[in-house]
Amino acid sequence: MTDQPIFTGAAGAIIDLTIIGGGPTGIFAAFQCGMNNISCRVIESMPQLGGQLRALYPEKHIYDVAGFPEVPAASLVDSLWQQTERYSPEVVTGETVVSFRKLENGNFEVSTDAGSVFESRALLLAAGLGAFSPRKLPQLGDISDLEGSSVFYAVKAKSDFEGKRVVIVGGGDSALDWTVGLQGVASGITLVHRMHEFQGHGKTAREVDEARDAGTVDVHLNTEVASIERRGEGIASVQLRRKNASVCTVEADRLLLLIGFKSNLGPIANWGLELVDNAVVVDAHMKTSVDGLYAAGDIASYPGKLKIIQTGLSDAAMAVRHSLTYIKPGEKIRHSFSSVKMAKAKKKEEEHA
């Protein structure tokens, strides 16, 4: 990934907008700050920007971002950062914002778990679904010693499954995507789903059906994982139990559990904001119940919200735009097309070259 400027100086500089969260929504919000001539700081709890795209499935291909017929998750993050870095936003990684307070002058002060304190004129929450942890199968007991070697909850590198017999558990988008995506990588793929039909995208479900008909994937519906058989420091097989109580054994080297994640807003849940379904309620201007505090992306809730990357990018643009009325009260907010703004910037660069 393109090198990121990491803010390491004294936390005394007052900037216009603090963006909490460095996933796609947060990165694009930083770009929008540059486009609107306001300063910003991005605070991300992970070691790198990119959120779930980089942390959980960097090699997963994404198909529903405008302008990208198909793009690996990590490449999308890199492109977003390349678009943003020209404005040199301050970036703080590896720190989690644990609290905020509104000052008498209307500014906001946030504190992190590392003891850092930052002040800004407005705040934007772009923390996705908050902290997340994978859902596990309680019937397997303690398998922590197998996690990351034989048992996985995400595909971070296809090489982990190269030439291996893989059992994939789940029926949503991730399970279907990797049933298709690991063909030609794994030596064998078995998909196990406890329900009678898939819940993932129709196109991918059809591709899985076609792979099953072609004999390149084994599919077990109405079936659950009952147990695993160990061999040395890995696994030898997975025992399956069908709803009719019959059982079967599938030889396996890897168990890929793609049954979702449990999200937790963490400290944000205690900030006194209006919440619904583990998300922060915003108005048409992306403003929360606290004046000067905005939210965008998966963490923001409003009628008709669709939780996809594309919507998060739109939310970010809206939130930054409307934050200007709080950051610069009384000033007339003028819209400038990006093509015009960039043309002026390039002309200025050429004049100073």
Swiss-Prot record:
Which InterPro entries does the record cross-reference, listed alphabetically? FAD/NAD-bd_sf, FAD/NAD-binding_dom, Fd--NADP_Rdtase_type_2, Ferredoxin-NADP_redctase_2
Q: What class of enzyme is it?
A: oxidoreductase
TM ranges are none
Q: Could you tell me what the cofactor note in this record states?
A: Binds 1 FAD per subunit.
Catalyzed reaction equations: 2 reduced [2Fe-2S]-[ferredoxin] + NADP(+) + H(+) = 2 oxidized [2Fe-2S]-[ferredoxin] + NADPH
Obligatory cofactor(s): FAD
Q: Does the keyword Oxidoreductase apply?
A: yes
Give the residues the record marks as binding FAD: 25, 44, 52, 57, 97, 132, 298, 339
Q: What protein is this chain from?
A: Ferredoxin--NADP reductase
Naturally occurring in which organism (per UniProt) = Chlorobium phaeovibrioides (strain DSM 265 / 1930) (Prosthecochloris vibrioformis (strain DSM 265))
